Structure formats: structure tokens, C-alpha cells
Amino acid sequence: MRVRARARSRRALVSAVSAAAAASLLLSGCAQDPKEASGPSGAPSGDKARLTLTVGVFGAFGLQEAGLYDEYMAQNPGIRIEQTSIERNENYYPQLLTHLGTGAGLADIQAVEVNNIAEITATQADKLVDLGKTPGVDKAAYLPWKWAQGTAPASKGGATVGLGTDIGPQGICYRKDLFEAAGLPGDREAVGALWAGDWNKYLETGKAYKAKAGDGKAFVDSASGVMAAVTGSSAQRFYDDQGKVVYKTNPAVRGAFDLAASFATEGLSAKLQQFTPGWDQGFANGSFATVSCPAWMLGYIQDKAGPAGKDKWDVAQAPKPSNWGGSFLVVPKAGKHAEEAARLAAWLTAPAQQAKLFEKRGSFPSASAAYALPAVSGAQHAYFGGAPIGEIFSKAAQGVPVTVVGPKDLVIAQNLADIGMLQVDQKGRSPQEGWEAAVKAIDNALDQ
């Protein structure tokens, strides 16, 4: 079975719906994938006197689209910024590793996806600038867990080589009309209280929903989506703090798998695979009442559920905070202008710029200092009944535990979902059979 790359869907899919999402944010000031390469944003051509900084990204990263390059160049007339973009991270990242290995072909600033940052900090930190020492960078302005992700292990020097651009704090998006029809509250505060602090309460709410709603209206979109959210709320997941793979013996991982499997065995799942046409149609048809949703998914839901879903969908706090998604900027030492590039990377990821990126592109800030800025603190989403998404997702982001991210986290997570849980959800296999199938696939992938 081909393992589906859930992680890569995020950047491409968000870019397609970010314009709609931004239009629905009731903000004070308030996409589509680029070609293989995109030139300087608003910079005059042929200006030989300007120092050119290059930025390499994947997908529609948002920095250029939000006008941040233009703003920086206006503030720094001697700087010209050029961006190149490769559409998919699975093509971009191997090239980045190759270029880091040779020290050639690198942009002055390179983007790194969260699923790759552990490998970068563990194996490439010596080739990257310590951005934690860049003037203007304040560790206290960033979420501790995000800062930790971009920092190399102590055994590798402990340098902070990646500055976070965005994150994906999760809530629970739900159909309030379906909740109310099943005798459950529709108000987001009351809904969040149903399962506050315990994912098992989310399961019990699903059982109560099914008892009234009956067959044909599933409670969740997929068991895999539940598993990812539950696993993401644990401090230790697939690796321990010594870098050892421990998912097989970690009770948090097996517990998340078994709990998610219960949504399938109890008949609460719509048995859909995320980011497939069937899943998209499920939003349009109202085939399920809830989905674990990171901040960036709201625009996707709006796009797929369409006008008919406006004011029917809402968003509440998840049982426990977790995160899905996010990226970083790194500065290779081999670059021609490493010092100037570090200053640009620091500016692009500063709280003020992250707030602008959220306002214009819907990318949720990884700098906690941005949460007090009006563009974030006052953000509401018209499609989701005016939900105070700035408040909801800021609270979730600040509660995410500092987690150990391993170099093969994505491989393990994909196989648990697409090999293990999918068999339970769609094929009726027992949870034990699904677990064993996933372990076998992971062992093969990791050559264990």
C-alpha cells in the first residue's frame, strides 16, 4: 500500500483556500501554488548596486504573498530579495539535503518543514547559522516547544538553527446544527466543556451523539484523524529524549491508537481517509459532526463545505492541546551573505511579521508574543459563526507540550495511520491486527 503523505498536503492545500480564509477573518486590516521559481517581489530589475538575498521555499509559503519581502526591501533599500519555490516538499527537501552536503546550490535562507526539522537539527546543525544569537531575536517571544524544535541537541552543539514561521494548533471543528439535533449543546464553550481535559470524554460524547442521531451521521470523519490529535497532545511520542525509537513501548502511542480505534469499532467514524475526494465530499454532505482541526484547516473546511455550511460549522477547544503542522527558516553558513540573511530571517519570523502573515494568509504565529497583537487577539472567523479563532488557537498553542521530535516521526505516523488505523476503520480489522500491521510496516521502513 502506498503511504499517503498527510504532512505535505498542508502547505499546498492551505494555499488554495487561504484567500477565502483571509476574507472570512473579521480582522482590523482585515492563494495558489507558485511556479517553480518566482522573482523578487516588487524589486526594481537591473539594480546592480543592491545586495541580493535569496530565499528557497516549498509550496506557496506565504511570505512573498503577504507582502513581507516588499516591506523589508522598502525599509532596507540596499537589499533585494529573490524567492525560489519548489511545489512539493518531498521534492524540495532531498535537494536541500544534497545542497547542504555539498555546500553549493543553497539559497541564503531555506525553509524547513516541521517533519524534517529533527533531522536537520540532528545532522546538519554544524552547517547552519545559530539564529538564536542574531540581534533582535528574543527566545522569550516564541513558544517554548517551537523554539525547542528548532534547536540542535546538546550533543550537537545546542544551537538554535531554525526560527519558526507558523504552527498548527488544533481545536475541534463541529457541526452545531447536528449537535443540537442530537440533544447536545451548540454553544462552543459548552461543547468544549463536554470533553475538556480528557480525550476519553470526546469518545463518550460521540456515543451520546450516536444514541440520538442514529445511523448515517458519523461523529468523526476518521479514526486516523483522532489518533493524530491524541498522539500530538503527548510530550513523548515516537522517540525518547535520547533519540531512541520507543513508539512500540510508549503507552501514550498505543493508548492513542486504541482510543482512536474505538471510534471505528463503536460505529462513530465516517471511515474516510483525509485529503481524498471522499473526505472533501463528506464536508459538503454533512457526513460527520466533528473533525480535529488545526488552525490552517478552517479555510479548507470552508472551501469544501461551501456556502451551505456557513454558520453550521463552529470550533471549540480540543480535549488537550496538540499541534499539526508548521515550518522554520534556516540560514546556511555556506551562503554568500549569511549575516544579512540571518537578520532577514529574524525579521520575517518576528512577532509583528507573524501577525501580518496570519492576517493575510491564515498562517498561525509560532511567536507567542504575537498573540497580544490585535491582528491575532481580535481575530474572528465569519464562516464559523464569528468564532474567536485568535483566542481559541492561542490558548491551544500555549498548552502544547514540549515534545521530542525524531527524524522519522513522519514515517512512523504515516504507517500508523495509513497501514494500521485505516485497516481498522475501513476494513473492519481488529485494533490488534491493525497495530501489528503498522508495526511491521514501520520496522520495514526503518530497517529494524
Across the structure, where does each feature detected by a protein language model lie?
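Paired acidic/hydrophobic, glycine-rich loop segments that form the ligand-binding mouth/hinge
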Residues: 108-111, 289-294
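A ligand-binding cleft/hinge motif common to bilobed small-molecule-binding domains
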Residues: 116-121, 295-309
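Conserved N-terminal structural module of periplasmic/extracytoplasmic solute-binding proteins
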Residues: 2-119, 138-140, 186, 336, ...
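Glycine-centered hinge/linker elements that transmit conformational signals in sensory
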Residues: 203-207, 242-273
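Short helix-initiation/N-cap motifs at beta->coil->alpha
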Residues: 85-98, 115, 195-201, 271-285
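Extracytoplasmic/periplasmic substrate-recognition and gating elements
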Residues: 265, 304-369
